[in-house]
Amino acid sequence: MTGEDVAARVHAYAWTDRKPGLERTRALLAALGNPEKALKFVHITGSNGKGSTAAMLASVLAAAGYRTGLFTSPHLYRFNERFQVNGAPIPDAALDRLAERVLAAADTLPEHPTEFELMTAIGFLWFAEAGCDLVVVEVGLGGRLDSTNVIPAPEAAVITNIGLEHTAILGSTLAAIAAEKSGILKPGCRAVLYGQSREVGEIVARACVEKNIPLTVTDDSQLTLLSSGLDGQRFTYRGSAPLLLPLLGDYQLRNVMTVLDTVDALRAQGRNISADAVAHGLAAARWPGRLELVHRRPDLIIDGGHNPQCAQALAASLRGLYGEKKLIFLIGVLADKDWQSMVGEVLPLAKAIVTVRPESDRAKDENELAAWVRAQGVPAEAHASIGEALDAALALAGPEDAVCAWGSLYSVGELRHCLGLC
C-alpha cells in the first residue's frame, strides 16, 4: 500500500462534528503503548513560519549528530512527507504497517479519533521505532487542544508569528489566539517567541511567568543582513559568524532568528550543538514550496502562502529580489480564505495573472478569480489544469522575466509534480 492509499484511509476520519480535545489522542496513544513517552521534543506553533522554522531546526539538529524526527503538515505531494527522520520521509512499507496498527487500535475506542489525531499517533510510533533523539513537532491547529499537545514537556516550546486565523475555533483577537497557542508551554521547557506585537508578547510572557518557564524573545536589532539574492541570504545574529541561509524571503530571516534562539534554548537544556553544526545545518536547510526558485531564464518561483500575511510577506520579498520589475503570477486559491486581500497584495507587482483551480473541494473557481483580477485592471486568463496554467504563464514570460506560482499549498504540490520535483 502506498502513502496515498494510507492517506485515503486516514482521511475517512476527517473532522465532522467532533469537539476539539486531547482525550481521543491520549486514549489512542495509551492503546499503542504511549510511544510519545520514549521521545524528546521541540514543539512549534504559530500562524506563519512554523513549518519553515521546524525544517531549519531539524536540519541543524541532524547536522549536530542527533537523529531527528520532523512532523509537519500539510504535505506538498506525498503523504509520507509529514513523517521524516533526518530528512527522509517514512517508507511506504513502514507507513502502511504503522497505519494498520493505529487504525486497529482506533477501532477499539469508544470515540474514533480524527484524521489528524491518527496522523499524530502514526508519527509518534515511527519516531520511537526509528530511535529519534529529538523530534521537532509542528502543531496542526492552535496549540492548547491540538492533538500534538499530548506530549510531555518539550525541551523547547516555540511560538512563531501569530495572526488572525481559524477565528471560529481559536478566537477573534490576537490575544485569544496567543492564549490558545501558549497552551503548548509546560513547566520544564524553555520558551522561544518570535518578537511581535505587545498584545501577543504580554500573553506569552504571562504564561511563562505562571509556569516558571524561561522565555527568549527574538531581537530584530541583533540581525545584520550582509547580502541577499537568488542564491540565498548571508547574515549574522547576536554576534554570530556570518551564516548562509539558502531559503529566500525576508520572512525567513525572521524565522531563522527563532531557530537560532531555539538552538540556544536547547543548549541550555544540555544539548551539544556547535557553531559549525548550525552553519552546516542552515546551509543544508530545504523547505520546498516556500519562495522556492525552481527554474532560471525565466525565473520560476513557487510559494504556498495561503493567507493575507503570507501574501504581504511574499510581495515584500519579491520587491527585494526584483525591485520594480513586474512579474507574471500563476495563482490558485481556496474560496474559504480571504482571497481578495491575498491577491490584492500582489496586484501592484503583476504584469499578468494566470488563474487555476487547486485540487481541493474548497477551491475558488478559476474563471471567477480571473474575472475579479481583470476588474482590478490587470490582464488575466483562466486554465483548468496546473499543467496548462504553467505552460500559459511561461509562454507570457521572456528569458529575463519572472513567474511566481502562488496561493495554495495544494497548487504548489501539483506544480512541483508537473516539474518532476517530487
Language-model features: where?
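N-terminal leader/targeting and accessory segments in enzymes
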Residues: 1-48, 52-67, 76-77, 190-193, ...
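ATP-dependent carboxylate-amine ligase catalytic core
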Residues: 17-18, 22, 26-37, 63-152, ...
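Nucleotide phosphate-binding/pyrophosphate-handling subdomain across enzymes
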Residues: 38, 134-137, 145-158, 162-166, ...
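Beta-strand->loop->alpha-helix junctions that form or flank phosphate-binding loops
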Residues: 71, 194-195, 207-229, 246-250, ...
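Acidic, Mg2+-coordinating active-site environments of NTP-dependent enzymes
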Residues: 110-111, 118, 131-138, 154-239, ...
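Active-site-proximal loop/hinge segments that shape catalytic or ion-binding/gating pockets
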Residues: 408
